[in-house]
């Protein structure tokens, strides 16, 4: 499945048949020799919500919250006939519960939890960075030449700055394009590469840019590396936030493990 270019292997595991090792997950997510994906999602049953999203990064290990993965999980649930018990879908992801709704054909709006740990003035080598946690940790740096930037090298250097980020971080480079719009490129921890989109990074970018006065609208259009646009809406207190955009089933298949 693809969430604005962020791609995932999604498996219906409601019967609990799959107990994948991190080696199996990594092999499946490896491009050219496996299926290839930024992460893997096991959709499982939940006692308190409509389903549980069990998310693993491409390195095979459990990941923190994945915004585009959450939107894809909701669209997948819709496709396999799971219907919300209330007005919105409710699903577990890690220790938290999220709400989301299908807003159109292949379109999902995910309601995010409030951000935490805003930090400014972080000097990572030559980069002046900001930081916020939107369910996953995100460093943010502003540039004027986003298309020419070597995200793999520069993002990797910031991601591995142990003094600032002992557990590592995702890294987002932003270019403001309008009072209500920006472009973003993201180096993702756990994928260890640039991805075509990052949902929690997109939310982090919009919130940080509004907080710093770089955008003035509380509805921000974010163009990701794939060329698609994600929408981030929020109130002034940043305790009501949503991420909305495309979520598509690209193909179905089987694999022998």
Curated annotation (Swiss-Prot):
Its main location: cytoplasm. It catalyses: (2S,6S)-2,6-diaminopimelate = meso-2,6-diaminopimelate. Pathway: Amino-acid biosynthesis; L-lysine biosynthesis via DAP pathway; DL-2,6-diaminopimelate from LL-2,6-diaminopimelate: step 1/1. Disulfide bonds: none annotated. Keywords: Amino-acid biosynthesis, Cytoplasm, Isomerase, Lysine biosynthesis. The active site is at 66 (proton donor), 198 (proton acceptor). Substrate binds at residues 6, 57, 67-68, 170, 188-189, 199-200. One of its GO terms (biological process) is lysine biosynthetic process via diaminopimelate. Catalyzes the stereoinversion of LL-2,6-diaminopimelate (L,L-DAP) to meso-diaminopimelate (meso-DAP), a precursor of L-lysine and an essential component of the bacterial peptidoglycan. Homodimer. This is Diaminopimelate epimerase. It comes from Chlorobaculum tepidum (strain ATCC 49652 / DSM 12025 / NBRC 103806 / TLS) (Chlorobium tepidum). The lineage of its organism: Bacteria, Pseudomonadati, Chlorobiota, Chlorobiia, Chlorobiales. The gene is dapF.
């Amino acid at each position: 499945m693809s969430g604005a270019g962020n791609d995932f292997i999604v498996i219906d595991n409601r019967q609990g048949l799959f107990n994948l090792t991190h080696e199996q997950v990594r092999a499946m997510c490896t491009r050219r020799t496996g299926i290839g994906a930024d992460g893997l999602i096991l959709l499982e049953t939940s006692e308190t919500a409509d389903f549980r999203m069990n998310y693993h990064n491409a390195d095979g290990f459990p990941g923190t919250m994945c915004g585009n993965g959450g939107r894809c999980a909701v669209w997948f649930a819709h496709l396999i006939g799971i219907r919300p018990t209330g007005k919105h879908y409710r699903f577990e992801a890690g220790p938290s519960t999220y709400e989301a709704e299908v807003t159109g054909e292949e379109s999902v709006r995910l309601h995010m939890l409030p951000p935490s740990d805003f930090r400014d003035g972080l000097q990572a080598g030559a980069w002046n960075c900001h930081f916020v946690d939107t369910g996953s940790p995100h460093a943010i740096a502003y540039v004027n030449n986003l298309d020419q930037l070597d995200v793999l090298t520069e993002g990797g250097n910031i991601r591995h700055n142990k003094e600032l980020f002992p557990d590592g971080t995702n890294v987002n480079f932003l270019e403001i394009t309008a009072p209500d719009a920006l472009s973003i490129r993201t180096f993702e921890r756990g994928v260890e590469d640039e991805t075509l989109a990052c949902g929690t990074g997109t939310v982090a970018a919009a919130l940080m840019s509004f907080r710093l006065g770089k955008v003035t609208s509380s509805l921000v259009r974010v163009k990701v590396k794939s060329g698609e646009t994600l929408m981030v809406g929020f109130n002034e207190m940043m305790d009501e936030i949503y991420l909305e955009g495309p979520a598509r089933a690209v193909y179905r298949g089987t694999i022998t493990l």
